[in-house]
Amino acid sequence: MLKSKYIYFFWLLVLFISCRHDVELPPISLQECEPLPNAVAAGCSYTYNNEIYIFGGRLLDGKHTNQHWRYTPQSDTWTKLESAPLKARVSCSACVVDECVYIGLGYSGYIHRDSSYLCDFWKYNLITHEWKRLADYPANTTVKNCFVKGDGCIYALYGFNRQFTQDVYRYDIEKDQWDKMDVYAPASVPRAMDVVGASCQGRHFIGTGFNHGSLRFWAEWNPEKQQFLPRKQKLGMGRIAASCCATDEYVYLIGGRHYGDTLTTGFFYSSIQRYTPQEDKWQYVGDMPYEAEKTVVECVGGTIYVGMGDYPKGIIQNYWYKIEE
């Protein structure tokens, strides 16, 4: 009898250690940086030459903006750039290829109006500061698409209009042409809206979002096979309106909201989760100082910068932090 008790406690300890392997909290530190002069949520961000750019979003007064900002980590300063020719919008997408950023899509206007889903697509030269309008996106699923850089092309994954999608469109940079791809996805990779993604170690990851409930799914986009491959789900409950970025080794998932079945079962996240592609493993690694959705997060030189976003009561913030492990 005593021996069986020891065996029981041994396996209980093994189970505890295996669980801790996923939820342990390696030490991270957050340092407050210079806040963005204008608080914004649902902005579009990208990096170039060790600087962070933020375009568009929603301001404190609820209006959409087309302001374009550049953050320089070395001096911890923000610079407002010249006005962009794009219409003010939220939830647009961007992808940097060489010295240009390809940016557009998004949403602006009244809810569920076709004219509110924006299909315009632009190229901005980060050296000459010239804008050029390119071929329009060929679908109206233009809310929060995930852009992925390919070989001479850009892939636009998912997106939303009035239905959940799983679409992939390929933009040929030389031809200035969009084409819809035939894509395979297993049942464990659902149609969804408000997904997030990032590229790490030459691989492309995407997940979370919403489809009749907040989602935990995580998948890898394989452009050669034109497939979504299921990966280990994120920890905890599902979330929408999260933010995502990658260092050389990890993908980070930050903030967001869990939308429950009723207005009383939803809540916001402050948690930071880290995904290791080589091990297909998630870990909790810390928390932001506040709960928020639709934040901005980017990585420069191995340092993660995160901030802005919507508070639980709909208040937009301009906080800006850097995270170093």
Functional labels for PLM-detected ranges:
Residues 19-325:
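Kelch-like beta-propeller repeat domains
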Residues 1-27:
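Bacterial Sec-dependent N-terminal signal peptides
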